[in-house]
């Protein structure tokens, strides 16, 4: 029995020496004593591959490559001990959660933290660390007692309480697992116990390689191996034996020196012979002198510069991380294509895997680079995991929309042999219905049939259901039953379950009834047929993982009664920790490795990426239950735990050294100057160190495309078709903007366009350069869309003027937004309009007078109107919750306040309403306005006028238009001029054109006014002394805005209290003390009103002609800071982009009121 050290710096050939010695023994005696090559988990495949591909070796029966856990599994298989149930981390955490719940009252600190996210995982990691470092619960209690008795040092009591709580949970966990279960940390303890009984290891030769330090458990295993085996050879990356004297903590080899000393002391304590250390002093790896110089001089002070030219060390500075990875990918392609490298010769070494993981996957896919990432992928996004999570959330949250449709969108609720496309469309329609009707809770689970009505007008209570609506309703209920029935059965079983076993059984039956194994098998077969082999294997893994999770729960908590919400929380925590098994690397792949974790063999080209400040050297992270300061306190007590932040800071140069010394031919060190959000990043101090060490090596700037990297030759961007196409399009875009490009890119274009596989892709990409995002609708298609007679509302005409494409999307394609079950501004506006109409009807029916309405009558009429209308708004949304009931009360107050103000207006006004919600169009109260368009198409304007008032004056009958608005609105003649606001003058034109039909005689225009329906808070700078001031303050916010006839008599008719030079509280006008109209009044002459009416008519004819001609241009207006795109629902459809040729705003010039009236007046004179 002996211990032998094989020492040497990185690249000295330690691994090669071990492998050659093993090969030699295999060749001499293939069936001799056991040879075990013990390496870290991530190194096992490479070592097995190296052994298998040994020339002259007929087999390797006697030699096997193991990691510590796999060696434990092999020995326990031989000696017994595998009969206990293996509990994964998820199962252990379930047990910890149960212990905390049961012993909460005894816990000093953790009882309050138990429900916090991630706490159980942290506690489990702490207990696992205690096991690895052979700390028992009793020892933890003893150390807690020492800390508690000590004084004068801050935080000792807190740490004592932590240790006490950890000890309590740890002890209870061990008691629960004892004799029945094994967790991941128990295998090495069992291995220690069973090595003495293992005939497999008796007299074996053990080679331990790839480790730099060991945990106490691993030291105990090595101790037993020293007793049982013939020889244990330990390879360490160290410059010399450390039999006498330890290096300084800042020494590069401090970590392996510690390991050397501990192993030596272990052998001496057990009377094991220590052979003379074998020190390999020659650098066998580095074929280039510069790399050898780097390995030798790194971390030496002072630095000895390497003055010769070299291409073995390359420094890349990139604009951002994507540019960095693309530059690396281009260089990998060049190495393989031009220098004969194999992908397996290349390694990507990363410390910040979370920042680069997805980027590497995306870029390497674009460049067709095969790679193996030494990192397990979480199962979060697998459909089965999402189904289980969403199904439990559906039950716990009582069928919330989001949870239900997360389950539906996994596709796993659909029938196993159903048409997937058909069921997805059905699910979309079902989702639209649920969103529009606010379906949740009992609406899903009751037997009550869902009803469907496409339209539900506020005054159309008895409209019969159409055959089309009835057919859709039948389909809707059929889809609902098919998708909701499995979830309903799951809910019933879960709520009947008496314990954890019952809950897991309910969930398993749910998955079985849905035939999940068969569906996943189909998905796997499809993925395999499409060449997605990794995905094909993942489907089976996901099913096994979920079933195993349920098994673990039953084993750990099966007999425990548990609230459903707590069960769902535990299962979700378990699902979050599920990971796909690592797929073994293929023969020829780039290895993507983590700087601190991976062990690499036979790498010729290494790329160390993301070398920024804060990454190398690494920042100390104070994570876990025990803080860095507390670890220091424990270390003072002699407690051995995993290296804390301080030690890791000392060890960091060693791991950087290993990465730098890894390649045998060329080293690339890269760093970005900005992250994905554009925030600046600083290069690591390592970059400065390398520049000082190699002064002849310059930093190479990498850009996103050839224009960003003038140093690079254009041909370096020509790699594989997919990636090259991206650069080609970038160059052609520059050429289109009259920039010069290298002739090489035309050759690239010709090659790609001549290739059958890439021709269509290139043509599609190139077409985008000349894409104008505009289209013309032929006149015949316009006729088919809109018909020979166009019936249009005024708002439709306005929409066309704002943007012709928005009109086409809305009225041609008939696109509309999803209807969502919530109260929105248009719904409030509808309610206000309908309420005022119904109040006016009740005033007329009950023979009341607007002028005589009291405040209480206004409140009564308003409350009754809102109560009648509310059930017809958005599927009774105002009755769906306490919040909406409160909003309904607020709306009643608004309507009551408005009604009272209207009553006050009536008292002061000579105008009286002659119509509310007056319709015009075929079958309406008034005929439509008709226009003959230039192609013979007839256009009719239809709509509804909120209110028309009439008054008698010395000149004759006066008519005015009042439009109710739920938000403040002013009449801007600029918008009228450009056709953006046509309603008011169209309504005025309608009532004046058909005045004889409406009031029995011709009429004159009195004005157009907006009335703001609201319930404002009265603000005053000082105390209001009398009722008159209060009344004035109450009426001021309700002053109507608009345009009035410039006639003093008309203004007095609108407000009899406008004398004495005061502003009217009703209309936007003021009379001076002499009775003249004040210049600030918003007025226009009768001829001006006529000119505005004629202008609006001309606009309608022009708009109608353009619609008939098929104008669908994407031409949104821009007026000051307002644009048509601001609130447009069709932005995702039109894809308006000012950067595209032909896309731009129609910029409208603001006009003053006088300028508009003058322009229109001149036009009238000319006509």
Curated annotation (Swiss-Prot):
Which free-text remark accompanies the cofactor?
Answer: Binds 1 [4Fe-4S] cluster.
Q: Say which domain of life the source belongs to.
A: Bacteria
EC number(s) per entry: 3.1.-.-
- InterPro entries from the entry? ADDB_N (IPR049035), DNA_helicase_suAddB (IPR014140), DNA_helicase_UvrD-like_C (IPR014017), P-loop_NTPase (IPR027417), PDDEXK_AddAB-type (IPR038726)
Which EC class does it fall in?
hydrolase
Cofactor(s) needed by this chain: Mg(2+); [4Fe-4S] cluster
Single GO biological process annotation from the record: double-strand break repair via homologous recombination
Family statement drawn from the similarity comment of this UniProt entry: Belongs to the helicase family. AddB/RexB type 1 subfamily.
Q: What else is known?
A: Despite having conserved helicase domains, this subunit does not have helicase activity.
**UniProt subunit comment:** Heterodimer of AddA and AddB.
- Name of the protein: ATP-dependent helicase/deoxyribonuclease subunit B
Protein species of origin: Geobacillus thermodenitrificans (strain NG80-2)
């Amino acid at each position: 029995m002996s211990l032998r050290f094989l020492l040497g710096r990185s690249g000295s050939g330690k691994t090669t020496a071990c492998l050659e010695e093993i090969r030699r023994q295999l060749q001499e005696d293939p069936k001799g004593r056991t040879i075990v090559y013990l390496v870290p988990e991530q190194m096992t495949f490479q070592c097995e591959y190296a052994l298998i591909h040994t020339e002259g070796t007929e087999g390797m029966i006697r030699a096997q490559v193991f990691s510590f856990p796999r060696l434990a599994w092999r020995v326990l298989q031989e000696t017994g001990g595998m009969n206990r149930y293996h509990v994964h981390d998820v199962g252990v955490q379930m047990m910890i959660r149960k212990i905390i719940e049961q012993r909460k009252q005894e816990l000093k600190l953790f009882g309050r933290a138990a429900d916090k996210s991630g706490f159980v995982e942290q506690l489990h990691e702490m207990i696992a660390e205690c096991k690895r470092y052979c700390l028992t619960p009793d020892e933890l209690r003893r150390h807690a007692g020492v800390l508690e008795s000590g004084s004068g040092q801050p935080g000792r009591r807190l740490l004592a309480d932590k240790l006490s709580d950890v000890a309590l949970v740890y002890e209870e966990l061990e008691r629960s697992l004892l004799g029945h279960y094994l967790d991941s940390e128990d295998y090495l303890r069992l291995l220690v116990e069973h090595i003495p009984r293992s005939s497999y290891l008796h007299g074996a030769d053990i080679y331990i390689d790839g480790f730099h330090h060991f945990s106490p458990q691993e030291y105990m295993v090595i101790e037993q191996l020293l007793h049982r085996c013939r020889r244990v050879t330990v390879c360490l990356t160290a410059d010399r034996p450390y039999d006498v004297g330890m290096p300084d903590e800042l020494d590069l080899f401090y970590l392996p020196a510690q390991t050397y000393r501990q192993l030596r002391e272990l052998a001496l304590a057990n009377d094991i012979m220590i052979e003379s250390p074998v020190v390999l002093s020659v650098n066998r790896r580095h074929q280039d002198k510069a790399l050898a110089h780097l390995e030798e001089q790194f971390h030496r002070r002072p630095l000895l510069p390497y003055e010769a030219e070299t291409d073995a060390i390359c420094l890349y500075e990139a604009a951002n991380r994507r540019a960095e990875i693309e530059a690396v990918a281009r260089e990998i392609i060049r190495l393989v294509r031009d220098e004969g490298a194999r992908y397996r010769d290349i390694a990507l070494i990363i410390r910040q895997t979370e920042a680069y993981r997805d980027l590497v996957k995306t870029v390497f896919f674009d460049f067709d680079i095969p790679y193996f990432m030494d990192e397990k992928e979480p199962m979060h996004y697998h459909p089965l995991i999402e189904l289980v999570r969403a199904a439990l959330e559906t039950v716990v949250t009582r069928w919330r929309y989001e949870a239900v449709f997360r389950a539906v969108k996994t596709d796993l609720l659909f029938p196993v042999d159903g048409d997937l496309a058909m069921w997805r469309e059905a699910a979309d329609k079902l989702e639209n219905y649920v969103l529009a009707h606010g379906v949740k809770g009992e609406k899903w689970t009751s037997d009550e049939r869902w009803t469907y009505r496409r339209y539900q007008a506020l005054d159309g209570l008895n409209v019969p259901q159409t055959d089309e609506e009835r057919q859709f309703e039948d389909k809707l209920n059929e889809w609902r039953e098919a998708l909701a029935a499995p979830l309903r059965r799951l809910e019933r079983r879960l709520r009947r379950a008496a314990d954890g076993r019952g809950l897991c059984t309910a969930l398993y039956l749910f998955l079985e009834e849905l035939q999940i194994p068969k569906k996943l098998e189909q998905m796997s077969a499809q993925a395999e047929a499409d060449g997605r082999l990794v995905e094909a294997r993942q489907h089976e893994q996901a099913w096994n993982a979920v079933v195993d999770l349920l098994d673990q729960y039953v084993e750990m908590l099966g007999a425990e009664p548990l609230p459903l919400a707590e069960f769902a929380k535990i299962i979700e925590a378990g699902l979050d920790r599920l990971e796909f098994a690592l797929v073994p690397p293929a023969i020829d792949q780039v290895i993507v490795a983590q700087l601190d974790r991976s062990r690499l063999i036979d790498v010729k080209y290494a790329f160390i990426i993301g070398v920024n400040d804060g990454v190398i050297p690494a920042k100390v992270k104070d994570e876990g239950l025990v803080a860095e300061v507390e670890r220091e306190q424990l270390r003072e007590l002699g407690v051995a735990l995993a290296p804390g932040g301080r030690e890791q800071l000392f060890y960091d140069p060693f791991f950087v050294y290993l990465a730098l010394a890894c390649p045998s031919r060329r080293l690339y060190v890269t760093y970005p100057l900005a992250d994905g959000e554009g925030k600046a990043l600083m290069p690591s101090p390592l970059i400065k160190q390398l520049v000082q060490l190699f002064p002849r090596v310059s930093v190479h700037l990498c850009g996103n495309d050839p224009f960003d990297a003038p140093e690079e030759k254009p041909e370096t961007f020509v790699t594989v078709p997919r990636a090259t196409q991206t650069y080609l399009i970038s160059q052609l875009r520059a050429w289109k903007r009259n920039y010069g490009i290298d002739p090489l890119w035309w050759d690239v274009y010709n090659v790609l366009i001549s290739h059958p596989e890439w021709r269509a892709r290139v043509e599609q990409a190139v077409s985008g350069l000349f894409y104008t995002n505009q289209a013309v609708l032929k006149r015949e298609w316009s006729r088919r869309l809109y018909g020979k007679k166009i019936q249009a509302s005024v708002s439709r005409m306005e929409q066309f003027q704002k943007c012709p494409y928005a009109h086409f999307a809305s009225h041609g394609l008939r696109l509309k937004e999803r209807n969502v079950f919530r109260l929105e501004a248009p719904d409030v506006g509808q309610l206000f309009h309908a309420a005022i109409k119904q109040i006016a009807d009740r005033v007329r029916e009950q023979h009341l007078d607007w002028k005589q309405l009291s405040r209480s009558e206004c409140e009564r009429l308003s409350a009754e109107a809102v109560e009648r209308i509310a059930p017809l708004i958005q599927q009774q949304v105002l009755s769906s919750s306490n919040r909406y009931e409160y909003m309904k009360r607020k709306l009643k107050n608004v309507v009551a306040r408005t009604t009272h103000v209207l009553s006050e207006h009536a008292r002061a006004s000579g105008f009286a309403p002659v119509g509310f919600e007056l319709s015009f169009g075929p079958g309406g109260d008034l005929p439509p306005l008709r226009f003959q368009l230039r192609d013979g198409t007839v256009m009719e304007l239809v709509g509804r006028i909120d209110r028309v008032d009439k008054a008698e004056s010395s000149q004759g009958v006066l008519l005015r238009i009042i439009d109710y608005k739920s938000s403040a609105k002013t009449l801007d003649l600029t918008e009228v001029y450009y056709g953006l606001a046509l309603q008011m003058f169209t309504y005025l034109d309608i009532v004046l054109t058909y005045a004889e039909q409406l009031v029995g005689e011709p009429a004159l225009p009195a004005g157009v006014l907006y009335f703001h329906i609201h319930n404002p808070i009265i603000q005053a700078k000082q105390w209001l002394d009398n009722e008159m001031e209060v009344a004035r303050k109450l009426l001021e916010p309700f002053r109507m805005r608009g345009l009035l006839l410039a006639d003093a008599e008309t203004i007095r008719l609108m407000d009899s209290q406008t004398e004495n030079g005061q502003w009217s509280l009703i209309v936007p006008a003021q009379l001076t003390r002499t009775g003249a109209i004040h210049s600030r009044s918003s007025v226009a002459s009768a001829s001006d009103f006529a000119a505005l009416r004629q202008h609006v008519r001309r606009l309608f004819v022009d708009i109608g002609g353009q619609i008939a001609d098929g104008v669908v241009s994407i031409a949104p207006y821009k007026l000051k800071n307002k644009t048509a795109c601001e609130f447009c629902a069709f932005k995702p459809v039109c894809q308006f982009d000012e950067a595209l040729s032909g896309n731009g705003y129609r910029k409208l010039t603001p006009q003053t009121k006088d300028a508009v009236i003058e322009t229109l007046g001149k036009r009238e004179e000319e006509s």
